[in-house]
């Protein structure tokens, strides 16, 4: 099976709580390889592009404010069915509905600060990787 790539963001709440190592460790223990990793504070324009599909929703402004509020870690993981594997590892968007053992189930408390973002499809992964790591995909 060919390797697939996916983008993961450890959001500002995860960075400030010191959970980057936990996230990276779980990704690696899952059998995926990290091929790019960067600590950065997002510019508003990048955040607005990244979350563009939510632009008309009432929570868009709050989402952009949060994701640009402090440093985050952007990383690209690679392996067979990487998108699907990471979605399972991350857990449901709402931490209350996330399974125990998932990152959100274990470490997140509220939907607005849910620790981590993962691409939801191979197509989204390509678009997101191109935005965060131009030239990598």
From Swiss-Prot:
Cofactor list: Mg(2+)
Molecular-function GO terms, alphabetical: ATP binding; metal ion binding; nucleoside diphosphate kinase activity
Subcellular location: Cytoplasm
Signal peptide feature range: none
Domain of life per record: Bacteria
The EC number(s) this enzyme carries: 2.7.4.6
Cross-referenced InterPro entries: NDK-like_dom, NDK-like_dom_sf, Nucleoside_diP_kinase, Nucleoside_diP_kinase_AS
Cited SMART domains: NDK (SM00562)
Gene3D superfamilies: Nucleoside diphosphate kinase-like domain
Enzyme class label: transferase
Pfam families linked to this entry: NDK
Residues at which ATP binds: 11, 59, 87, 93, 104, 114
GO biological-process terms attached to the record: CTP biosynthetic process; GTP biosynthetic process; UTP biosynthetic process
Keyword Heme applies: no
Record carries keyword ATP-binding: yes
Entry-linked CDD domains: NDPk_I
Active-site residues, Swiss-Prot/TrEMBL: 117 (pros-phosphohistidine intermediate)
GO CC, any one term: cytoplasm
Location, primary (coarse class): cytoplasm
Family membership noted in the UniProt record: Belongs to the NDK family.
Subunit composition and interactions: Homotetramer.
Protein name: Nucleoside diphosphate kinase
């Amino acid at each position: 099976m060919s390797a697939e790539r996916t983008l993961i963001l450890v959001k500002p709440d995860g960075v400030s709580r010191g959970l980057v190592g936990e996230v990276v460790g779980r990704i690696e223990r899952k059998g995926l390889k990290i091929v790019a990793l960067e600590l950065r504070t997002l510019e508003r324009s990048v955040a607005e592009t990244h979350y563009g599909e939510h632009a008309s929703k009432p929570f868009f402004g709050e989402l952009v404010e949060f994701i640009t509020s402090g440093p985050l870690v952007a990383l690209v993981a690679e392996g067979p069915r990487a998108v699907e594997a990471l979605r399972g590892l991350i857990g449901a968007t709402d931490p209350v509905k996330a399974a125990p053992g998932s990152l959100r189930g274990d470490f997140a408390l509220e939907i607005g600060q849910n620790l981590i973002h993962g691409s939801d499809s191979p197509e989204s992964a390509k678009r997101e990787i191109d935005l965060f790591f131009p030239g990598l995909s």
